[in-house]
């Protein structure tokens, strides 16, 4: 599958198989995020791989009670160092940088025949990941799972 095929094929998936995602595939997906461009190559993101069912349920609660979040075997919680770095246009860098990295990850997952779903509705005040990376803010995240194709 080439990148254009992955773009055409990728869609939001909210029903998952309970089959675990192999570490090798997860590492490929995380590497795709790591290789994403960022403002001044700051790489302000931190990715937390969540497999623990209780933590996934807390993430689901923090994601406006979207229960499907807790049903996936893996959630990649995207966190960002929020030091206030701003582009010349006045926009904070981290939301754009994290979004680019997550998009790279969703396309890599699609190539591996895994389903993903962006989770943008999120209440950071609930702090479902403990401990989370120091001074990091939890940002939109993705769910990762085998899906029914």
Question: Where in this protein do the model-derived segments appear?
Answer:
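Specificity-determining recognition surfaces
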Residues: 1-25, 147-149
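Small-aliphatic-rich amphipathic alpha-helix that forms the alpha element of a beta-alpha
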Residues: 33, 76, 88-130
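A glycine-rich helix N-cap at a beta->alpha junction
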Residues: 67-72, 133-149
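Short secondary-structure transition/capping segments
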Residues: 54, 128-133
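Glycine/small-residue-rich phosphate/adenosyl-binding loop
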Residues: 25, 31, 35-101
């Amino acid at each position: 599958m080439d990148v254009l095929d992955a773009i055409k094929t990728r869609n939001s998936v909210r029903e998952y198989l309970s089959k675990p995602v192999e570490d090798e595939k997860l590492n490929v997906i995380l590497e795709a995020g790591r290789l994403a461009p960022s403002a001044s190559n700051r790489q302000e993101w931190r990715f937390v791989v969540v497999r623990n069912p209780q933590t996934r349920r807390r993430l689901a609660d923090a994601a406006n009670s979207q229960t499907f979040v807790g049903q996936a075997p893996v959630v990649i919680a995207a966190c960002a160092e929020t030091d206030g770095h701003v582009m010349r246009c006045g926009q904070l860098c981290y939301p754009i940088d994290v979004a680019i990295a997550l998009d790279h990850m969703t396309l890599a997952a699609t190539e591996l025949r895994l389903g993903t779903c962006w989770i943008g509705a999120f209440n950071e005040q609930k702090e479902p990941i403990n401990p989370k990376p120091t001074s990091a803010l939890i940002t939109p995240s993705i769910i990762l799972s085998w899906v029914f194709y």
